[in-house]
UniProtKB/Swiss-Prot annotation:
One of its GO terms (molecular function) is iron ion binding. It holds the Pfam family Iron_traffic. The keyword Iron applies. Could be a mediator in iron transactions between iron acquisition and iron-requiring processes, such as synthesis and/or repair of Fe-S clusters in biosynthetic enzymes. It comes from Acidovorax ebreus (strain TPSY). Keywords: Iron. The keyword Iron applies. This is Probable Fe(2+)-trafficking protein. GO terms for biological process: cellular response to oxidative stress.
């Protein structure tokens, strides 16, 4: 049986993550409060941030920026929008 959490991002009960996706206290908070669906949404947003801002993940500052954005996305006022991103029109 799948583990469920009350997802802080979706505001409903949903399937929880299988393991903490990030080390430390932030990873534990995410594991306890974020669903698989919300985590997948974050991965898509993180990919846009990396691509649109041309972040080099070998740079510690870029990784720190993404960690702050991840915390804001789930537990704060929301992550930055991807600069220059234009959603496709239907």
């Amino acid at each position: 049986m799948a583990r469920t959490v009350h997802c802080i991002k979706l505001g409903k009960e949903a399937e929880g993550l299988d393991f903490a996706p990030y080390p430390g206290d932030l990873g534990k908070r995410i594991y306890d409060n974020v669903s698989k669906q919300a985590w997948a949404d974050w991965i898509k947003h993180q990919t846009m941030l990396v691509n649109e801002n041309r972040l080099n993940l070998a740079d510690a500052r870029a990784r720190q920026y993404l960690a702050r954005q991840m915390e804001n996305h789930f537990f704060g006022s929301g992550a930055d929008a991807a600069a220059g991103y234009v959603p496709p029109s239907a």
